[in-house]
Structures are given as C-alpha cells and as structure tokens.
A protein has these predicted regions:
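An amphipathic, aromatic/His-enriched active-site/gating alpha helix that lines ligand/cofactor pockets
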Residues: 58-90
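Short cationic amphipathic helices and targeting signals
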Residues: 52-58
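Short S/T/G/P-rich N-terminal loop/turn motif that feeds into the first structured element of a domain
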Residues: 1-51, 62-64, 87-109
C-alpha cells in the first residue's frame, strides 16, 4: 500500500453541526475508508490558519484516494481538502536513485 496525507479546512457548516451534535468522527470516516480498503494511521484535528484537519493513511492507489476525496468534498463541510502521496525515507532514496540514473540521458548545452 502507498502512504498518503490528507489535510483540509472545515467550514462553518461543519462547526455548526459539531456544536449541535458533538461526535467522534473517526468511526464514521472509518466506514468510508474501509470501503476502499484503506488503513487510517492518524486522524487529527488542529487549528491553524491553513487547515483544521490532518490525516495519514494507507491506500492502494491514487484513484482510490481521489474517489475518497470526491465524496468528502461533496459533503459541503470543507472549505478545502487536499491529498498528496507521502514517501518514507527508503522510498524517497529510491526516487533519487532513479532520477540519478535518468540524469545520464539529460544533456545541457
């Protein structure tokens, strides 16, 4: 599985819903991620200027991630919601090893 990071900013509709009915969102989201065979590693709320939610999860593909994000965005409770692929240190090294090999064909003038 591949590692992904999700981060976004909840809107006032989300805050209003939580004020009216405070609830643990993790079990609700887990039902959704389970449908895509994903594993949640971290599920965190924070209060920064840029984002109020941060999650790390494992998924099989970018397509699965984008499908999850489309459902999340359609809820209307997020100002923005983004995802990106994350690499551990060995994966990161392999990317640069591949780039180094590819660099041999790059000619500058």
């Amino acid at each position: 599985m591949k590692t992904y990071i999700i981060y976004g900013k909840a809107n006032s509709e989300y805050a209003s819903g939580m004020l009216n009915k405070p609830q643990d969102r993790l079990p609700i989201i887990k039902n959704l991620t389970d449908q895509f065979g994903m594993k949640i590693r971290e599920f965190l709320f924070t209060h920064t200027e840029s984002f109020t939610f941060f999650s790390v999860l494992d998924a099989n593909s970018d397509e699965d991630m984008e499908s999850l994000m489309n459902i999340t965005r359609a809820s209307g409770t997020w100002t923005n919601m983004y995802w990106s692929r994350a690499f551990d240190s060995l994966e990161h090294m392999k990317i640069y090893e591949k780039a180094k090999t590819g660099m041999a064909s790059y000619v500058t003038t």
